[in-house]
Amino acid sequence: MSLPDGPRTPPTLQLIQWIANPLSFMRNCSERYGDSFTVYFGEKMSRAVVFSDPQSLQIILTSDESKQFDAPGELNVVFEPLLGAQSVIGLSGDRHRRMRHLMMPPFHGERMRSYGELIADITDEVMRGCVIGKRFVLRKCMQTITLRVILRAVFGLEEGLRYRQMERALVSLLDASSTRLSVGFLYFPILRQNLGPLSPWGSFVRKREWIDRLIYDEIAERRTQQDTNRNDVLTLLMSAHDEAGEALTNGELRDELMTLLAAGHETTASALTWAL
């Protein structure tokens, strides 16, 4: 299969350009090579074909009956430092299918509709904090809404000490993960040098460990309580079993919670901001 043309610069240089200014890099490629082009993001990564035409994306997402297009988990291995080695987006084959099967029940239509009132209440709570006639940053409000929805609907936390600790810890880690340097950590393992809590990577590791302690404490507490009346995603994941009767381990639960956080926080906040 022939691939669209694209930049001929060394793969590592393409990756650096993308990390430094992704919008500029993609825009320049689109203007030079058209609606589809091929890039190389790093020496060990496969070629990636980028599509910027909405009609092409629609065909890929809705008309791929022959399953020509695939998204193997290996392409997402760069997110392992944040999401963990057992995240569903980093798995392939049978392991991926098993995890998807276990994660599907909490996201059935009726279950999702039951979260509507909670989402509306959180939205009202956050927006009431905005002063009429005074400027505010909309994206910040959307980030707060999505994070609190995740804490309540996914993690199942109620207002209290652990809720506040988790909110602070997640904001701290997500802020640290959104810098260009942190993206460099994901793609260039040689940069992951833990030189103490004040070093960039050391600070990231410390914040991740803080999150992990809070998550594992919450999981341990839930296993002790065994409250089957709760309808948050964590409770439903803990009660799920695969075809062999195996439940998710604590490590798998942690990684999937972090995956849901990463997938539902920044992306949803950005989409809501653009929509408004």
Mark where each language-model region is.
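Short hydrophobic alpha-helical segments that form membrane-spanning helices or hydrophobic packing faces
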Residues: I60-L61, T268-L276
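Active-site catalytic pocket residues across diverse enzymes, especially alpha/beta-hydrolases
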Residues: D64-E65, H241, L276
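Generic hydrophobic alpha-helical segments
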Residues: M26, I219, L257, A275-L276
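N-terminal membrane-proximal hinge/A-helix region immediately C-terminal to the signal-anchor transmembrane segment
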Residues: M1-A85, I89-R98, R113, E117-E125, ...
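Cytochrome P450 heme-thiolate monooxygenase catalytic core
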Residues: M1-L3, Q68-F79, R95, R111-S270
